[in-house]
């Protein structure tokens, strides 16, 4: 055999041996290292992508004090889902609902109704919820003479101002005048209310209730409209609360939020004299802008109402305020009851009416039902399950 060929074969065999040896021994750490680095990278990526779960704490607390710093006991505080009462030192605590938008109190009879400002006398008894805020304190101002023994309550239905201009109005000299709805409401309705207040004996406490449909977005959404009607409603000496109506929301979250931004919670209460007023949103939308008529309540609202009334002394009179009549309507919820009166054919009473009456009948001071929506004034009386029930419908203003 050629000597050079032998040397070449030996070199090849040595190379193969070295390679085999390297694969068997030296390459194992290299493979492990690659695998370990890949695993570490995957673990790092997983940790990076998986955000830690932050548990939100919905526990809140606060106090209600008078201007002297004294705690106010026995005041109902709510988040719109549950109600609690302040203790003997005016303190309260609760676990608010994750969907709550306001923390607010039921204005006691011995205290002034707080307002947005000295020139905007719409009621401001609430604070907007913030996820960063855990303490909600309120300061109340005592009425100089204590709880009022008499007062006037001006109730109006459906201001329903729009963004559009109303039809032409005729001036005293027969010239046509074009006015916006807000201007018309301000120069006519509010002017009349101010004149009525002026005619009362000096010092008479005066309060107001709007029964909802403060606005209607006829002609498109207008972000300024709710604020404009609030400023008009708050421009007199009366301290005014408002119910929310169907046109204030029209089944759209944006519209409802704009009303809440200006007037606060939609389900609330307040006391004047020996009367406990409860205002509640009974506009139940089920298909776009369609709503049930008679009015209805959601189950969570029923729970809230039961809690509110359970914390209210039973010697009070209760006035339940809402927009759509509970005693009649012709676009009913499936569980609504047909009215039996011959002249009421095709009309129904709310599926909640029986429950509401059972809750209201607990109060020795009696009860009344206030609504709007109809645009005309009437006292609607029906015989319901053997009982005469009257509902006061307030005319559009």
Show the residue positions of the predicted features.
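Extended active-site neighborhood of metal-dependent phosphoesterases/phosphodiesterases
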Residues: 108-116, 122-132, 219-312, 339-368, ...
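Short, ordered, surface-exposed loop/turn motifs in non-cytosolic proteins
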Residues: 58-81
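Active-site glycine-centered loops adjacent to acidic/histidine catalytic or metal-binding residues
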Residues: 158, 212-213, 245-246, 323, ...
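Active-site-proximal beta-strand elements of phosphoester/diester hydrolases
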Residues: 150-166, 172, 274-286, 319-321, ...
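Short Pro-Gly-centered beta-turn/loop motif in secreted/extracellular proteins
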Residues: 70, 93-102
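Short, acidic Ser/Thr/Gly-rich low-complexity loop/linker segments typical of extracellular
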Residues: 75, 81-95
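N-terminal active-site segment of His-dependent metallophosphoesterases
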Residues: 28-59, 97, 112-219
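Short acidic, glycine-rich surface-loop motifs adjacent to enzyme active sites
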Residues: 309-336
């Amino acid at each position: 055999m050629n000597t050079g060929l032998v040397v070449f074969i030996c070199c090849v065999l040595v190379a193969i041996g070295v390679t085999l040896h390297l694969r068997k021994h030296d390459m194992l750490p290299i493979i492990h290292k690659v695998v370990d680095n890949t695993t570490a990278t995957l673990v790092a990526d997983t940790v990076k992508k998986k955000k830690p779960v932050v548990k939100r704490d919905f526990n809140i607390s606060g106090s209600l004090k008078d201007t002297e710093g004294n705690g106010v006991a026995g005041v109902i505080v709510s988040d719109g889902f549950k109600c609690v009462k302040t203790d003997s030192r005016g303190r309260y605590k609760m676990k608010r609902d994750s969907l709550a938008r306001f923390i607010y109190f039921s204005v006691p009879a011995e205290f002034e109704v707080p307002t947005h400002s000295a020139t905007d006398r719409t009621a401001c008894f609430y604070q907007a919820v913030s996820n960063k805020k855990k303490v909600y304190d309120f300061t109340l101002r005592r009425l100089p003479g204590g709880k009022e023994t008499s007062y006037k309550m001006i109730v109006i239905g459906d201001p329903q101002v729009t963004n559009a201009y109303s039809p032409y109005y005729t001036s005293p000299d027969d010239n046509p005048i074009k006015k916006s709805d807000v201007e018309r409401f301000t120069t006519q309705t509010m002017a009349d209310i101010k004149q009525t207040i002026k005619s009362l004996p000096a010092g008479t406490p005066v309060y107001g209730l709007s029964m909802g449909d403060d606005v209607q977005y006829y002609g498109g959404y207008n972000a300024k409209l709710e604020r404009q009607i609030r400023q008009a409603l708050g421009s007199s000496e009366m301290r005014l609360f408002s119910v929310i109506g169907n046109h204030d929301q029209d089944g759209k979250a944006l519209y409802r939020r704009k009303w809440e931004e200006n007037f606060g919670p939609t389900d609330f209460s307040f006391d004047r004299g020996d009367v406990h007023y409860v205002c509640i949103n009974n506009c139940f939308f089920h298909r776009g802008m369609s709503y049930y008529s008679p009015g209805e309540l959601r189950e969570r609202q029923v729970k809230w109402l039961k809690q509110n009334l359970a914390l209210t002394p039973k010697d009070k009179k209760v006035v339940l305020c809402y927009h759509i009549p509970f005693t009649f309507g012709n676009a009913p919820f499936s569980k609504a009851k047909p009215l039996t009166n011959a002249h009421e054919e095709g009309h129904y009473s709310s599926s909640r009416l029986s429950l509401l009456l059972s809750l209201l009948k607990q109060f020795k001071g009696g009860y009344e039902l206030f609504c709007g929506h109809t645009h005309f004034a009437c006292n609607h009386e029906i015989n319901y399950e053997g009982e005469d029930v009257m509902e006061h419908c307030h005319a559009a203003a």
